[in-house]
Design a protein with these regions (language model features):
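C-terminal beta-signal and adjacent terminal beta-strands/loops
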Residues: 540, 609, 710-720, 739-804
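Face-selective signature of the C-terminal outer-membrane beta-barrel domain
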Residues: 233, 273-305, 309-311, 315-498, ...
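Gram-negative outer-membrane beta-barrel transporters
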Residues: 393-395, 401, 479-480, 484, ...
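Surface-exposed extracellular loop regions of Gram-negative outer-membrane beta-barrel proteins
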Residues: 242-258, 417, 494-499, 510, ...
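Transmembrane beta-barrel wall of Gram-negative outer-membrane proteins
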Residues: 177-206, 211-248, 267-290, 487-489, ...
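A beta-strand signature from Gram-negative outer-membrane beta-barrel systems
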Residues: 119-121, 130-174, 184
Length: 804
């Protein structure tokens, strides 16, 4: 860490000297950003006491990816990419170690907004990046150290600004295709007429997937109608999107060694649908006061089917259900003393019952045993959420005591209603690892539950969460170089959960979480093109309805699925410190922009996900303290012929406590399935080192070529919180792209991903190789507990773009 900190301090020094030489040659253009979710009168970027990274529309087009996460990963220092779902359209990003993920079960530490609307889903704060059309994005601003964005902004916030007819005019259509059966297309149209504007964007994509049984289909639409005059501007906008995926997920490493495209148990599919309607606007009350506001309604539906390994065994002869099917009881705490009625009740609770509440017998013959049957389950969940809300904000830019000043006050309300149901059916794992039914085996295809509702229990619940926020922030120019910012946001989260079936009354709960989060900092303009900043803030996130219902290790949940009665969770509080430099200067006929910073976020009562001994299940737990600290360095040079960028990030993400955590499939786990964590152990799934670089070169006025390099360091497997096992290896990927403008309106383009066809993994965790799949007749015997999500091999795509 010391060497990295020295690098973070010294590297900007070279650029500072350059700034001094260039100071007289240029006056940097003022860049205005919106530092609150609502788009209104922004603020000079150099007066914001934290890091801001902006990704522009050209960057999304340059990446030529249907996934917004690919571009954020490529262009934002400190953003890493993970893929626990095993599908490139459903990847998650982690910024400074905090996640924004579509996966239920991932604790979410980033707030995501579009048009002032919170995109974190109501039920689990997840972010479904696949539902956002990339061609409709004008820019994406990634903020740190800013609690004004409300809940989940522990690591920062991503604020997406879509295009409209005032900011984008014309017509553009493109179609492309290539490896693994991919065909994708998009169009956008924008027009301005008098006070009115219109904008629409649409995208579609179909891909068979490079891994087995991993097809993808996407359809996305965004539209905007705007009106403005000298004092006001209003936009009515809406979007609809649908997506379906084959979710290949992680595969045992021994299977990948035989076939890099192999998958473990199937089916694994996810289908998402969403619709959004919103209205936002701003109105100039006076020369100094501006009012901004938004209203919205949003619908989201998700259906998930997951074929899983079955952790079943023949019931104990000491139970009331000998020669019947039971859930394996390994990993569950036995009562003390383990005798008599207590022992009998413990064993009986694991008996598997069918939809008619009857125990399921073992198949006849072979000693009437269940132990040789490759049992599996098909788990199904459905989530339907309706969210609506609004926000109102006032901005004043009147001078205070003769000094420049910007004051913002606002508030927001977001309310979500969710209906959720989940169930498991008993299945049979065939040699190809597909989970289906076998009529020769009793209980096949029946919805199952355990006698004690442990691990398996049909569920139907409704939840309601209402989030209130009120905030104020002020930036005061102490001098023409020195600006001070101070602000505060008060969050209230009311969360209600109700059991619809009436079979799990312990699920019924009413919870309230609240907190006042301050922010403060200073910026100092050392030179016209060089600014120093320092800031401090606090932020919080409340446990989600999913997390509140899934924190009991004795009743684990199928993540993305079942909820159970549980001990309460505490809200997470983050304390962030940040210092840095940023600058811009003229260089070699172009412009150079750079930034360098140090950061630290200490989180108390952090929520983490822990695995259960039951396949596919886990639970949530507060841990006393975690720390994420590090360095970010980045620079970008642009001229008429060149674009060059490079960034480096170092993230030291560690636990700051001693204690036992559950990780039953970890090779180093003790007899109780636990591992021991001590202060300084690294949080799994977060690479310490990342280096990214790219270049574009205009060979001629019509022909452009470019390349990108992404190098990611080692990281610990998820589940190796004690850092006792080998790490997930580092990797590097080189991508190429080119475009040729055939005429004024027509451009041909092509992309190559993973030029050198490197084999690498985006995610690693552990599994139990002795489960039901081990009895399915596999051609190899699985013994290695490591399981990986492999990265995509060499792929090439090409297309045509027409712009009028």
């Amino acid at each position: 860490m010391k060497k990295t900190l020295v690098l973070g301090v010294l590297a900007p020094g070279l650029l500072v000297a350059m700034q001094a030489a260039q100071a007289q040659e240029m006056l940097p253009e003022i860049q205005v950003v919106a530092d609150t979710p609502l788009q209104g009168r922004g603020i000079d970027r150099d007066k914001v006491p934290s890091t801001i990274t902006t990704v522009h529309a050209d960057d999304f087009q340059r990446a030529a990816s249907p996934n917004i996460t690919d571009t954020l990963f490529q262009r934002v220092p400190g953003v890493s990419l993970s893929d626990p779902n095993g599908n490139s359209a459903q990847q998650e990003i982690r910024y400074r170690g905090f996640a924004a993920s579509p996966l239920q079960g991932t604790p979410q530490g980033l707030a995501v907004y579009m048009n002032g609307i919170r995109l974190n889903e109501a039920f689990g704060d997840t972010v479904n990046w696949d539902l956002i059309p990339t061609n409709a994005i004008q820019q994406a601003d990634v903020f740190t150290n800013n609690p004004i964005f409300g809940l989940n902004a522990l690591g920062g916030a991503v604020n997406l600004t879509p295009k409209n007819g005032f900011t984008w005019q014309g017509f553009e259509q493109e179609i492309s295709g290539g490896s693994y059966g991919r065909v994708q297309g998009g169009l956008q149209f924008g027009a301005e007429s008098g006070n009115w504007s219109t904008y629409i964007a649409a995208q579609g994509m179909q891909d068979q997937g490079w891994r087995q049984k991993s097809p993808t289909q996407l359809g996305r639409f965004y539209g905007d109608i705007g009106w403005r005059d000298d004092k006001a501007e209003f936009h009515l906008f809406g979007s609809v999107a649908t997506s379906s995926f084959g979710v290949a997920a992680a595969t045992p490493i021994e299977m990948l060694n035989r076939d890099w495209s192999s998958v473990y148990t199937t089916p694994q599919t996810t289908q998402n649908n969403t619709a959004l309607l919103g209205l936002n606007g701003k109105y100039a009350l006076t020369d100094n006061w501006t009012l901004q506001g938004s209203l919205y309604g949003r619908f989201f539906r998700q259906s998930h089917v997951d074929g899983n390994d079955g952790d079943f065994e023949r019931c104990s002869n000491s139970s009331s259900y000998a020669n019947h099917l039971c859930l394996e009881d390994d990993g569950f705490a036995r009562p003390v003393p383990f005798t008599g009625a207590a022992a009998l009740a413990f064993r009986n609770q694991f008996a598997i019952l069918d939809a008619n509440n009857q125990p399921i017998p073992c198949p006849p013959g072979a000693g009437n045993t269940c132990g040789t049957v490759p049992y599996g389950t098909i788990d199904r969940t459905n989530t339907r959420s309706t969210t609506f809300g609004g926000s109102l904000q006032a901005t004043n830019e009147e001078k205070l005591f003769g000094h420049g000043n910007r004051f913002v006050i606002g508030g927001s309300i977001d309310r979500g209603n969710t209906d959720f149901n989940g169930s498991s059916t008993l299945g049979y794992i065939f040699p190809d690892l597909s989970v289906g039914t076998n009529p020769a085996i009793p209980g096949m295809g029946s919805v199952i539950h355990t006698l004690g509702d442990v691990g398996f229990a049909p569920l139907s619940i409704t939840s309601r969460n209402t989030y209130y926020g009120i905030y104020a922030t002020d930036t005061f120019d102490i001098t023409d170089r020195l600006a001070a910012t101070a602000g505060v946001r008060y969050n209230i989260a009311d969360i209600t959960v109700r059991d619809i079936l009436g079979t799990s009354p312990d699920l019924n709960s009413d919870s309230r979480f609240s907190r006042l989060n301050p922010v403060g900092g200073l910026t100092y303009k050392i030179l016209p093109g060089l600014t120093a900043y320092a800031g401090y803030s606090e932020s919080n996130r409340a446990p989600t309805p999913l997390e509140l219902g899934c924190s009991n290790p004795n009743k684990p949940c199928l993540l993305e699925s079942f909820l159970v009665s549980d001990p309460p969770l505490k809200q997470v509080v983050g304390h962030t410190y940040e210092v840095g430099l940023r600058g811009t200067s003229a260089l070699w006929g172009g412009s150079l922009n750079w930034k360098a910073g140090l950061f630290r976020t200490d989180s108390t009562d952090d929520i983490i996900t822990l695995a259960s001994s039951i396949a596919g299940r886990g639970y949530y737990q507060n841990v006393p303290e975690t720390r994420r600290q590090g360095v970010e360095l980045s620079a970008e040079y642009k001229s008429s012929q060149w674009m060059v960028y490079a960034s480096y990030s170092y993230i030291d993400a560690t636990y700051r406590f001693s204690g036992d955590l559950a990780s039953p499939n970890n090779p180093m786990a003790d007899d109780d399935g636990n591992i021991h964590v001590v202060p300084g152990n690294h949080i799994p799934g977060i690479p310490q080192h990342q280096f990214k670089a790219g270049v574009d070169y205009m060979v001629t006025a019509e022909w452009k070529v470019g390349a990108d390099l992404i190098a990611v360091g080692q990281q610990y497997f998820v589940g190796d919180d004690s850092n006792q096992n080998p790490k997930l290896p580092a990797y590097a990927v080189v991508n190429l792209h080119t475009s040729y403008q055939v005429s004024k309106n027509v451009t041909l383009f092509a992309n190559i991903n993973n030029l050198f066809n490197n084999k690498y993994a985006l995610y690693g965790t552990y599994f139990d190789p002795s489960g039901g799949a081990a009895k399915a007749g596999l051609p190899i015997t699985l013994t290695d507990q490591r399981t990986l999500v492999p990265g995509m091999p060499f792929a090439i795509y090409g297309g045509i773009r027409v712009k009028l």
